[in-house]
Amino acid sequence: MAKAKRTTKFVCQACGYESAKWMGKCPNCNEWNQMVEALEPSKKSRSAFNHTGEPSKATPITQIASETEKRVETNMPELNRVLGGGVVPGSMVLVGGDPGIGKSTLLLQVSAQLTLTNKKVLYISGEESIKQTKLRAERLQVSGDNLYVYAETNLEAVQETIDFVKPDFVVIDSIQTVYHSDVTSAAGSVSQVRECTATLMRIAKMQNIAIFIVGHVTKEGAIAGPRLLEHMVDTVLYFEGERHHAYRILRAVKNRFGSTNEMGIFEMRDVGLVEVANPSEVFLEERLEGASGSTVVASMEGTRPVLVEIQALVSPTMFGNAKRMATGIDYNKVSLIMAVLEKRVGLMLQNQDAYLKAAGGVKLDEPAVDLAVAVSVASSYRDKPTRSTDCFIGELGLTGEIRRVARIEQRVQEAAKLGFKRIFIPKNNEGNWKIPKDVQVVGVETIGEALKKALPD
């Protein structure tokens, strides 16, 4: 009997767009020279990828027994917080980040911590030999009889090893190096990444194994390949930070089992990653007192308030158009706030260059940072510093009003804990909550009122 003919298609390596013919430019993402030929998987292999759990039948939701899945804590509180309290058995976690940021270091340390809970961990490296992994483990002072290391990129061999070792946790470093023999395209292609991830997901669900996979990122900072990879997994973590700075930030951008607003702080040292228990002190330890353009905001990262310094430098432009730059703060937010300052306060900023930065490499995207940004710009423009013990919390409206923000009591308590004596908050946030001792809470209704009190003439 003749074999069924397998059809050929062309897949964009940037976005996953499929076409029956080759094209120089992808019509979906407009990238050039990204179309790669690939064969459709056979029906036999494709059917295995689609299954993600034990056989089941349609059941009324009222007849399904509710179970609370016990999480496994990693002995790393910062990671536990980001994951929502620990690792959920049977889940699949994708960890992305720039090259050299510390993804492999983080997962090797996590593997060692999990073995301390009498769990068996299989670390599969597609980028290093087992001897190279051993050298890195020695540098990180990582060891344990329950930590197994395996260097392989063939997915069938990986499956056999998982069946033999029977681990509780598996680490794949990285998904772009793993390939499936039923898929003809090269490792790291859209087809390979999709099929390998689907197979690993099936293993995780059927055998109740938590799997961590490392994903490469593009030059724009997104996970390489189509967004399908991020849709398939349960949790997506991004490991951020400047390679030339010691601090690293772990964020969850997707989490089926917890919040996506949590943040974990780590410091890279010669012995690996060390957790930072109080990030507010870290972000403020190098603040220069008496400098204009410097303010502090209490920002919420999930359930944790974090104090961050916002710096602004405003100076007359030397060219026709004023220049605006922002690091860690949304550029559009900065433009909006400066427009409000011009219209509602009368600051002549149209011929001023403005450079803003959230110190410490933190990214601030919540509305409560608006007031601190506005005061820092005005402080630099007038060359008049705020008090070193002032903290600013509030959202700025287009009419110049200061709008209420959530969890004001937690923010104020965190600021008071670090020695801030005068805290500016929205007038509407004043209410029946406990104000810390020796702290003056100043409620303001407009940005003009806030500037008069923070930067008096």
UniProtKB/Swiss-Prot annotation:
GO biological process, any: recombinational repair
Query: Source organism's superkingdom?
Result: Bacteria
Q: Where is this region: Lon-protease-like?
A: 353-457
Domain comment (free text):
Has a putative N-terminal zinc-finger, a middle region with homology to RecA with ATPase motifs including the RadA KNRFG motif, while the C-terminus is homologous to Lon protease.
What are the cysteine partners in each disulfide bond? none
Is this entry keyworded Repeat?
A: no
UniProt family annotation: Belongs to the RecA family. RadA subfamily.
**Which EC number(s) does UniProt give?**
3.6.4.-
Classification via HAMAP family: RadA_bact
Q: Name one Pfam family in it.
A: AAA_25
What exactly does this protein do?
DNA-dependent ATPase involved in processing of recombination intermediates, plays a role in repairing DNA breaks. Stimulates the branch migration of RecA-mediated strand transfer reactions, allowing the 3' invading strand to extend heteroduplex DNA faster. Binds ssDNA in the presence of ADP but not other nucleotides, has ATPase activity that is stimulated by ssDNA and various branched DNA structures, but inhibited by SSB. Does not have RecA's homology-searching function.
What organism does the UniProt record list as the source? Listeria monocytogenes serovar 1/2a (strain ATCC BAA-679 / EGD-e)
Q: Name one GO molecular function term.
A: zinc ion binding
Extent of motif RadA KNRFG motif: 254-258
User: Keywords assigned by UniProt?
Assistant: ATP-binding, DNA damage, DNA repair, DNA-binding, Hydrolase, Metal-binding, Nucleotide-binding, Stress response, Zinc, Zinc-finger
**UniProt: ATP binding residues:** 97-104
Q: Where are the zinc fingers (C4-type)?
A: 12-29
Q: Which InterPro entries match?
A: AAA+_ATPase (IPR003593), DNA_repair_RadA (IPR004504), P-loop_NTPase (IPR027417), RecA_ATP-bd (IPR020588), Ribosomal_Su5_D2-typ_SF (IPR020568), Ribsml_uS5_D2-typ_fold_subgr (IPR014721), Rubredoxin_2 (IPR041166)
- What name does the UniProt record give this protein? DNA repair protein RadA
Biological classification of the source: Bacteria, Bacillati, Bacillota, Bacilli, Bacillales
Presence of keyword Zinc-finger: yes
Enzyme kind, highest EC tier: hydrolase
